[in-house]
Regions:
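Non-heme Fe(II)/2-oxoglutarate
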Residues: 1-28
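Catalytic core of Fe(II)/2-oxoglutarate
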Residues: 42, 47-48, 55-60, 68-153
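A short coil-to-beta-strand element that immediately follows conserved catalytic motifs
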Residues: 30-40, 76-77
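Conserved short hydrophobic patches within well-ordered secondary structure
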Residues: 12-13, 62-67
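Short secondary-structure transition hinges
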Residues: 6-8, 50-54
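Short, conserved, surface-exposed binding loops centered on an aromatic residue
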Residues: 14, 27-33, 53-58, 72
Length: 153
């Protein structure tokens, strides 16, 4: 448990590590994930965005975004979109309800995603979590992640 986080967050964090959750995630996605790799709080505000990009870390990586932004209006930019290639004009899905929702994408060579430029005075609150295949012998199925030397929550 992390003393910097409240009891609700610690309960949520513990659940994300549970066999119950991991088995449900594997069953739902069909992706052989074994454990959580990263857990990050993310806050985007007016002027925030993320250019479209592709990680392609490996075939056993899921990226999950949980959103906690009340009153997000349909069509407003800021949710993590999914695109057919690393080009904002190729968006195929963009969440519009960011109040207690989630987006799951399987990482790979065609999993382009990003967030359009936020023009309103709003805050997009989210948690970004990577789940990935892991072995004691070989480590993470997708290798080390960018920022591995930095502390993660």
């Amino acid at each position: 448990l992390d003393p910097k986080l409240g009891p609700e967050w610690n309960k949520f964090f513990k659940f994300l590590h549970s066999d119950e959750f991991l088995n449900a995630l594997k069953k739902f996605s069909g992706v052989a994930v074994d454990k959580m790799k990263t857990f990050r709080f993310v806050l985007y505000q007016k002027g925030g965005f993320q250019l479209p990009h592709i990680h392609n870390d490996g075939p056993s990586t899921l990226i999950v975004f949980f959103y906690f932004s009340k009153g997000w209006e349909k069509g407003d930019p800021g949710g993590t979109y999914v695109a057919s290639e690393a080009d904002e004009s190729k968006i195929i899905f963009e969440p519009y309800n960011l109040d207690n929702t989630m987006v799951i994408l399987q990482d790979g060579p065609y999993s382009a995603h990003g967030a359009r430029y936020i023009v309103k005075d709003v805050k997009r609150k989210a948690i970004q979590i990577y789940f990935e295949g892991y072995s004691e012998e070989t480590g993470w199925s997708g290798g080390e992640y960018e920022g591995a030397d930095k502390p993660q929550v």
